[in-house]
Amino acid sequence: MKDQVKQIHFVGIGGVGMAGIAEVCLNLGFTVSGSDLKENPTVRHLISLGALIQFNHDASHVKNSDVVVVSTAIAKDNPEVCFAKESRIPVIPRAAMLAELMRMRFGIAIAGTHGKTTTTSLASAILTEGGLDPTFVIGGKLNQFDSNARLGSSQYLIAEADESDASFLHLSPMMSVVTNIDEDHMETYQGDYANLEQTFIEFIHRLPFYGVAIVCIDDQNIQNMLPKLSRKIRTYGFSESADIRATEVLHQGLSMHFNVKANDLPEFSVVLNQPGKHNVLNALAAITVALELDVSIESIQKALAGFGGVGRRFEVYPSRSIGHKNVTLVDDYGHHPTELEATLSTARMAFPEKRLVLVFQPHRYSRTRDLFDEFVQALQHADLLVLLDVYPAGEAPIAAFDSKALLQAMRLRGHKENLHVESQQQLNELTETLLLDDDVVLVMGAGDVGQLARDWKQQAY
């Protein structure tokens, strides 16, 4: 590729998925340029590596580019995209560039509605500890590397595979992982679960006949899909029918202890430096990948015990002063009812006897509409709920399915400990009266609520 392509331009380079691919391209020796509307830590990191980044969208930015990479968030009438098409500069989706990087390596693609970022991070950490030195591209910052991407020296490339727009069908990996299948991003699938399932089947069939698919047997939707697959399958889970399963699972503070049983290996123990039974499943997926590649049990144990976590995935910041109250802050990206329930359940186990205050920003009106009853059910597990306005992500408001509607539905079901705030500034003004010493404050959502968590962990007031 380097003989034909010298400069790669990324439109919307500040997005975590785009930035990871851009970083790998920089490290491969390509000239990387890009544009975005605002600066953020990810963009500053890329600039420090040599990327040429502009903070507006203008046709002049792409004049010297050999290819333009876009994410699904970029409008078709973007001036850079329009100029590139008029100039016959190839315009390709982010996943197509990832596929090109994967084509040159042994690709490991990790998909699923929930848990794929953590699973990709765990697999990357284990393979690195095992001496395989993989390249990885992740949808979140792997804390021990302080980055969401890294160019390794080996043939292995581990990547998070995105089903939200079905773009994972661009990939042709040697090994695929599916953590679970749940209804989300249903606008991509015409609101029909059968279309979603068929797309996951096609994703697995992107494997060569000698490839392997690793799937969670505990997930009912995956169980239903298995008879439709015609590739080698390895299963993991808590179920006795799993090829690789966890037993003797014990929650201790912010870590999980369990044993791993595999059909062809002696049982071994694991300490995972992450809380929650859902993270045991994520770890099992990563362990299965590692065992397929002959990584030693000792390397698996060491990597999981020392795992530094992922940005905004149950990131815990103890002893923070918020509103002059001493609290524990937990920052999490979860924005689907299943993720809310898993995170709140994990917090209950990690912080027994403490009051859980959930600050939640719903993400997209369409998701709130499609999963309205599920959100109402999941949000009731908090002791105190603070709902921010829905983060629209470019969607037009739907009044019947906004935060006020969620709040009203919860109160009709008897959950009175909740309130709606219209802005993060208003929330900051209310913290002194809302919070108590020793509270656990969970900040959750996929929108700009992450900035609130960053502000709270960086400054006491």
Curated annotation (Swiss-Prot):
Its EC number is 6.3.2.8. SUPFAM superfamilies: MurCD N-terminal domain (SSF51984), MurD-like peptide ligases, catalytic domain (SSF53623), MurD-like peptide ligases, peptide-binding domain (SSF53244). The keyword Metal-binding does not apply. One of its GO terms (cellular component) is cytoplasm. InterPro entries: Mur-like_cat_sf, Mur_ligase_C, Mur_ligase_C_dom_sf, Mur_ligase_cen, Mur_ligase_N, MurCDEF_pg_biosynth, UDP-N-AcMur_Ala_ligase_MurC. Keywords: ATP-binding, Cell cycle, Cell division, Cell shape, Cell wall biogenesis/degradation, Cytoplasm, Ligase, Nucleotide-binding, Peptidoglycan synthesis. One of its GO terms (biological process) is peptidoglycan biosynthetic process. Its main location: cytoplasm. It catalyses: UDP-N-acetyl-alpha-D-muramate + L-alanine + ATP = UDP-N-acetyl-alpha-D-muramoyl-L-alanine + ADP + phosphate + H(+). It comes from the Bacteria. Belongs to the MurCDEF family. This is UDP-N-acetylmuramate--L-alanine ligase. The gene is murC.
